[in-house]
Design a protein with these regions (language model features):
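Conserved GNAT acetyl-CoA-binding A-motif
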Residues: 190-201
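Conserved catalytic-core motifs of GNAT/GCN5-like acyltransferases
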Residues: 62, 219-233
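Acyl-donor-binding surface of acyltransferase catalytic domains
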Residues: 16-107, 113-115
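Conserved acyl-donor/pantetheine-binding loop and adjacent beta-alpha core of acyl/acetyltransferases
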Residues: 109, 113, 121, 125-161
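Conserved active-site alpha-helix within GNAT-family acetyltransferase domains
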Residues: 203-222
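Residue-level recognition of the GNAT/N-acetyltransferase active site
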Residues: 169, 202
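Conserved acetyl-CoA-binding loop-helix of GNAT-fold acetyltransferases
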Residues: 165-168, 174-188
Length: 263
């Protein structure tokens, strides 16, 4: 009888584990579908193909010494926005909804993979989110985030943090909100003991360039030529002279500085 009872418990545990995996897979599928739908709805089918099929797109890897940060809360306070930490309790509380549904599904996925995040919220609606990944100090690159591996990082410090996928709802992208959100999230990470942040942006993403490099003064570490075909990516380091002429479209160079800031 005891043996039969043990076998029944084992079978029940196995069925529970399989069901849990199926739910996670279903959430991943839902996230991908919602993400594609949002992208196509906002920017058309061409934007989708641009994200999953491209050749030699320039990625700029950047770093920020978090000791250089200064408080800049006015843009968020003026827009009645606040910074919140995203964790399982926050998502499961039912107190907050996401302005863009695919970002909620992404949040579930990122938390499942051990990432941390911060939300930009007005009242109980999340209008922006940004994510980070912490690796233990290691000399084995296999323990690093896949982006860091792709960009040639071979070691890491426990005081460093990798930041990625900052998003602000289109209706909120004005008055320096995106840059202030990024700055506030970095201040929050500094308060946790991190001393340096790394990230990357695409050279053809002009708003990301102005938010990260111009307003928040992140420093360039290196540049890569990245090609992607669906799930497969390849990154090749660029020499500085190769990267320089690819960072800013020629049409933008003729726009006065004051007008660029309004992009």
């Amino acid at each position: 009888m005891e043996r039969e009872s043990s076998e029944l418990r084992s079978n029940a545990d196995l069925r529970g584990a399989v069901a849990g995996e199926q739910i996670l897979m279903l959430n991943d599928v839902r996230m991908r579908i919602a993400q594609v739908a949002d992208l196509v709805r906002s920017n058309g089918w061409s934007s989708l193909f641009k994200e999953v099929l491209f050749l030699k797109r320039t990625a700029i890897v950047v770093e920020k010494d978090l000791s250089e940060l200064t408080e800049r809360s006015k843009p968020l306070a003026s827009a009645k926005l606040k910074l919140l930490e995203i964790d399982k309790e926050m998502l499961s509380s039912g107190l907050y909804s996401f302005a863009v549904n695919s970002r909620y599904l992404k949040a579930l996925n990122y938390l499942k993979h051990g990432c941390g995040g911060y939300a930009l919220a007005r009242d109980n609606v999340v209008v922006g989110d940004t994510w980070h990944y912490v690796s233990e100090a290691a000399d084995d690159p296999r323990g690093l985030h896949e982006d860091l591996q792709r960009f040639g990082f071979s070691s890491w410090s426990k005081d460093y943090v990798y930041t990625f996928d900052i998003f602000v709802a289109p209706a909120e992208r004005k008055g320096g909100i995106s840059a202030a959100f990024q700055n506030s999230a970095m201040l929050a990470l500094r308060s946790k003991g991190y001393t340096k942040a790394y990230g990357f942006y695409w050279a053809d993403n002009i708003p990301a360039h102005w938010c990260t490099r111009v307003t928040n003064k992140w420093k360039e570490v290196r540049a890569f030529s990245v090609s992607r075909c669906l799930m497969f990516k390849r990154a090749v380091p660029l020499r500085r002279d190769q990267a320089a002429h690819k960072k800013e479209p020629s049409w933008l160079k003729n726009i006065p500085i004051g007008e660029k800031k309004g992009i």
